[in-house]
Amino acid sequence: MSVSILVVDDETDVAELFRQHFRREARNGTYVMHFANSGEEALDKLTAGIEPQPIVILSDINMPQMDGLELLREIKTRRPDLPVMMGTAYGDDERRRLAGEYGAACFITKPVDFDFLKTQLRDLSDAAD
């Protein structure tokens, strides 16, 4: 079974970075990656029904307009069962606390440790099975 992931980040180079680090897994069908450049675009994709449906979302916190914390709250209102991993380059304790309070599955710091991220994704996909 493929694990479908929606990565949300306003930095345009993030999609390419994820494609590089998940190249092998994408090729063998372990992961299917979807990308959105804003919280609004992520909600549009979830509403439109991208296939396969994401079983986990990885969102940046610091984005213009709808930030990652607002996105997290909206996703948890619509799909409380969908795990959302939050990422940021800033070690802000208050944002980390809020992310946990709003229902984040875990917190990832940037630059991303892709080995750690893959372990987290495996754990979440095993829990979803």
Roles of regions detected by a PLM:
Residues 113:
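Receiver (REC) domain switch/active-site region of two-component response regulators
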Residues 117-129:
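Receiver (REC) domain switch/output surface
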Residues 70, 90-108, 116-119:
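Alpha4 helix (beta4-alpha4-beta5 surface) of REC/receiver domains from two-component response regulators
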Residues 51-58:
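Active-site beta3 strand of CheY-like receiver
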Residues 12-35:
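Two-component/phosphorelay signaling modules centered on CheY-like receiver
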Residues 35-47, 68:
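Helix N-cap/capping motif at the beta->alpha junctions
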Residues 63:
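Receiver (REC) domain active-site loop signature in two-component systems and cognate sites
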